[in-house]
Amino acid sequence: MATLEQKLEELVSDTIESMGFELVGIECQRAGRFLTVRLYIDKEGGVTIDDCSDVSRQVSAILDVEDPIADKYNLEVSSPGLDRPLFTLAHYQRFIGQEIVIHLRIPMFDRRKWQGKLESVEGDLITLTVDNETRQFAFGNIQKANLVPVFNF
């Protein structure tokens, strides 16, 4: 059975791509009775507020017609930001060499949160260097992952 995120991606990805954007990913977060649907978009050269607004209008129209969400919800459209979320294996592949933080579904060595340098992606295994040790994580066990912003002053 498809998740809500997968259903939404099927509904809106073609429209977003036809507008010249990459749909980086979708997050659905519940807070009490309300649901926040967050779409991350990107394009070469970055995303502006006007871009987010345009995509939001188009996606809202699709969701109004298709009505895939039974509950009340807020739609947010944004750029991935400095702490860009990683949703797919291709995202991990793209950012090899970068510092990332991952949150696991099932703890490994009594830890759910790991931060380290992304070394490789082989099949569905993600390899990080954490505290000078190599650790491998199954992609399916990663609940959430983000780039760690680097500030050079």
Swiss-Prot record:
Origin superkingdom: Bacteria
InterPro entries for this protein: Ribosome_maturation_RimP, RimP_C, RimP_C_sf, RimP_N, RimP_N_sf
Keywords for the protein's UniProt record, in alphabetical order: Cytoplasm, Ribosome biogenesis
Record's subcellular location: Cytoplasm
Record Gene3D superfamilies: Ribosome maturation factor RimP, C-terminal domain, RimP-like superfamily, N-terminal
GO biological process, one term: translation
Pfam families associated with the record: DUF150_C, RimP_N
GO cellular component, one term: cytosol
Protein task: Required for maturation of 30S ribosomal subunits.
Family classification: Belongs to the RimP family.
PANTHER family: RIBOSOME MATURATION FACTOR RIMP
Name under which the protein is recorded: Ribosome maturation factor RimP
Lineage: Bacteria, Pseudomonadati, Pseudomonadota, Gammaproteobacteria, Pasteurellales
Gene name tied to this protein: rimP
